[in-house]
């Protein structure tokens, strides 16, 4: 029974409200952005979930909750910016014995690393480790690995790149003479080109583990 769930780096709650359909108990979404949290709570109210799902502004690196009070910590697409090994070790104290973490993190799927890709992700603020390395970090932190699997490429192409392309069109119309916007978009397209060429070697990986 999942009595208490944290969704860290929840954004506006896209995945949180999917979780709420499948998991009983309370879910607290935490995000640094107050604007995201406002949207999150408005969505919860619209769905009639405000008594069970609530968003709070805060940092996944500084949780203001009791130790061993959480059944599941969920984090999609946010852990890599602050450090996989660092965060899973920190979060463990807040999980009940036998509690779970479920996180996604961009990872190498092979030991055959590409320097150009590594450099891009380091510049972006989050270097890539191999999936095997991250599983090892979970075990070192005191978890049992339950499942590890790569998300399909469509999660990048259809759910990330395509919506971003649409947003880029709006930016260009709003700021037609902005060098900063053009540089930003060029960086986006470079990221896409790397994934198109090397996407068989790296991708987002889902890690599910249980606290010992």
Question: Could you describe each region identified by the protein language model?
Answer:
Residues 149-212:
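Conserved Class I S-adenosyl-L-methionine
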Residues 2-11:
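Conserved class I S-adenosyl-L-methionine
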């Amino acid at each position: 029974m999942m009595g208490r769930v944290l969704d860290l780096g929840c954004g506006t709650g896209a995945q949180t409200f999917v979780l709420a359909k499948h998991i009983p108990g309370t879910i607290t979404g935490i995000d640094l952005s107050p604007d995201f949290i406002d949207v999150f709570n408005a969505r919860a109210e619209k769905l009639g979930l405000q008594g069970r799902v609530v968003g709070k502004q805060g940092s996944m690196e500084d949780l203001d909750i009791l130790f061993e009070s959480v059944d599941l910590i969920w984090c999609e697409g946010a852990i890599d910016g602050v450090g996989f090994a660092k965060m899973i070790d920190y979060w463990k104290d807040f999980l009940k014995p036998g509690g779970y973490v479920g996180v996604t993190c961009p990872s190498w799927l092979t030991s055959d690393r590409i320097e150009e890709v590594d450099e891009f992700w380091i510049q972006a603020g989050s270097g890539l480790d191999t999936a095997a390395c991250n599983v090892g970090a979970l075990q070192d932190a005191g978890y049992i690995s339950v499942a590890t699997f790569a998300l399909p490429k469509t999660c990048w192409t259809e759910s990330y790149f395509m919506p971003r392309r649409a947003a880029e069109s709006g930016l260009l119309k709003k700021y037609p003479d902005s060098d900063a916007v053009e540089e930003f978009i060029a960086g986006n397209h470079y990221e896409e080109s790397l994934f198109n060429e090397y996407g068989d070697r790296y991708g987002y990986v889902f890690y599910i583990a249980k606290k010992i």
